[in-house]
């Protein structure tokens, strides 16, 4: 489990803390919104395209696809462990 978290989050190491946390928050809100771009955008007070762009950046930094359930599950685990331990 620790290895999965480390590998999933490794790609964010070069980002400033504020930017990294913004991406993590976007993912969390998107998940809490049942993967609805529109609902996540309302919570985040931004345009749905902004949510899409941020999620694509998460895919780029992690090498995971948010259209693959296994990848989404790994990212959920990684972000939750990060939130609780960091």
What residue spans do the PLM features occupy?
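Cytosolic nucleotide-utilizing catalytic cores of signal-transduction proteins
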Residues: 1-86
């Amino acid at each position: 489990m620790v290895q999965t978290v480390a590998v999933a989050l490794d790609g964010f190491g070069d980002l400033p803390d504020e930017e990294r946390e913004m991406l993590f928050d976007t993912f969390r809100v998107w998940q809490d919104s049942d993967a609805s771009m529109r609902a996540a955008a309302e919570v985040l007070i931004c345009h749905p395209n902004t949510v899409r762009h941020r999620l694509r950046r998460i895919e780029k930094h992690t090498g995971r696809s948010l259209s693959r359930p296994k990848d989404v599950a790994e990212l959920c685990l990684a972000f939750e462990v990060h939130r609780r331990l960091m």
